[in-house]
Amino acid sequence: MSMVRSFFDGLTNVLSGAGTSVDKRVHARYGLNIVDQHQVEASYRTSWLARKIVDMPAHDMTREWRDWKADGELIGKIEAEEKRLCLRERVTQAIVLGRLGGGAIYLGIKGDDPSQPLAVEHIRPGQLSYIAVFSRWQLTIGQEVSDPEDALFGGPDYFQITSIANKVGVRIHPSRMVIFKGAHVMRGIGSQWEDAFWGDPIYQAVGDAIRNADSAQNSFASLIDEATYDVIGIPGLMERLSQPGGDAQLSKRLDAARQGKSNHRAIILDSGEGGKDAETWVTRQVTWAGMPELMAAFLQTVAGASDIPYTRLLGTSATGMSATGEGDKNDYLSSIATKQETMLRPNMVRIDAVMLRSAGIKDELWFDWSPLFEMGEKERAALDKLKADTAKVWGDSGLVPIDALAKGAQNLLTEDGTYPGLDEELKKAEAIVAPDADVAPVVANPDDLGLTSEAKPKPLLKIVGDAAPRPLYVNRPLLNAAEFIAWAKAQGFKTTTPADDLHVTILYSKTPVDWMKMGTDGWGSDAKGNLDVAPGGARIVEPLGDKGAVVLLFTSSSLSWRHEEMVRNGASHDFDEYQSHVTISYDASDVDLSKVEPYRGVLKFGPEVFTEIVEDWKPTGGEA
């Protein structure tokens, strides 16, 4: 019976020898050369490239730190506790040690036996005394816990400190240690349990690439000393050397040539007889063609092996047409964000469970990692505008209570540092004594406002003080009426609205509403309830309505938000849309409005005045 053999053309090719015994590649094998503690330390301390590969991701993981989802007071307490413990610095150090082969953070609990399990639920305020960082080589670990039902499964049953004076031999329960591991090690034939627990140093997989790059750089540096060299030709050199005293004569000749070059900046050579048998001296230069590209190739290999972009690792700009490096940077930061979630967050959750209780805070709070992407001024401004627009949309929708939304927006502005000092100013604003709960937010008498006589609102509307549902008209009197009228006169208005009637309308609601539900103004008012509209911005003078009014239109987000807040609380607005304005005059037929320059100064408004609507109201005579 004949034997039939099948040959497959692919990875194995008997004609070309690929994949067969004559192919050199089939004899290649990976060897496991364990990088020991001394090599790790030597690499980290002597190679700038090795150090950056370890430090850079660790610092990037903690660079922007985290944002707590809590109110400003709680966030302040948490940040104070973090600073006391130097938490951010300790975590960064532990990540570095983890990348060097393993690190750990010890939670130092005051008055506790470190060898006993940590009862997190029994932590009292102030009990977390300190946190300490150890490398794997400062700790001895016990036996592996192999029971899958044990909470310590896969880890040691104890740790022992081996490098602290007066504490040698102290055993620590694993619940008091937070482990920062190196690269994952697969449990196999060639791996020890301790190595599998701590993980590999980063250098175990990247070491060859780093050594090749360092070697290429050192070799290139050595060649610099030989950048130029001299080629000297001496006729009959070998014959002279074979004669007695030939060596001395050659040395003497070369010394004379060097001395002439040094003293006279000239080389004296024997030109021979008729140019025959003449000495020669030629300076040549080493060609560096391809050397920079070769070194760059080694460094690119290191960048790929370490998962750090070439431009980030070396601090260089991207090369190539239209290259910005943004794609590489975004990919890198995305990988850092992944490490934060999968590697760092579980450890932070364990630390926070103890730290928050020690700070007297419930451990139900949670956090997000702060964005890693660094934005320019334009990008930041665009993002801030987007956040503001989003807050406005949620406020307009009525799905989120306005007070809760305002508090969240204030926390956001405080945390991202958009407005320095905002936190203190908000505390001052909150410290202002609010009116009693049983007092309606209604001004019963204009004299109580403390306004000047010309700024008091004209008593054309009936002022009331009870809280029964009724139509509502809300306005703010213009305090700097004299300045405003002087501007109007200068623009050609013969008569203007009387000073005591100049105001801005906030709400005109024919729908009866509970005035108590309108709340108190918190949109930009100062301690006295006054509101200033800053100079400039969009301002227009044009007719408005069917009663001959000419008004100054202006924009104010504080007035708009306050109007929308009242509408959300049940009021109506019986006009097409809300537009803040001050009525200049009801008699301006002889004024060419196209030539009027709008009022650009500050508009100072007094506190809100709540009144009922007067249905048959008509404009009165103007101020001459």
Curated annotation (Swiss-Prot):
**UniProt keyword terms in alphabetical order:** Hydrolase
Q: Where is the signal peptide?
A: none
Q: Which domain of life is it from?
A: Bacteria
What's a Gene Ontology MF term here?
hydrolase activity
Annotated catalytic residues: 503, 505, 581, 583
User: Which of this chain's residues are annotated to bind 3',3'-cUAMP?
Assistant: 106, 617
- Which sites bind 3',3'-cGAMP? 106, 617
Catalysed reactions, semicolon-separated: 3',3'-cUAMP + H2O = U[3'-5']pAp[3'] + H(+); 3',3',3'-c-tri-AMP + H2O = A[3'-5']pA[3'-5']pAp[3'] + H(+); 3',3',3'-cAAG + H2O = G[3'-5']pA[3'-5']pAp[3'] + H(+); 3',3',3'-cAAG + H2O = A[3'-5']pG[3'-5']pAp[3'] + H(+)
Which additional comment does the entry carry? This homolog of an antiviral immune evasion nuclease may be due to cryptic prophages, or it may play a role in regulating the endogenous antiviral defense system based on cyclic nucleotides.
UniProt lists the family membership as follows: Belongs to the anti-CBASS protein Acb1 family.
Purpose of the protein:
Counteracts or regulates the endogenous CBASS antiviral defense system. Phosphodiesterase that enables metal-independent hydrolysis of the host cyclic di- and trinucleotide CBASS signals such as 3'3'-cGAMP, 3'3'cUA, and 3'3'3'-cAAA.
- Name listed for the protein in its UniProt record: Anti-CBASS protein Acb1
Organism placement in taxonomy:
Bacteria, Pseudomonadati, Pseudomonadota, Alphaproteobacteria, Sphingomonadales
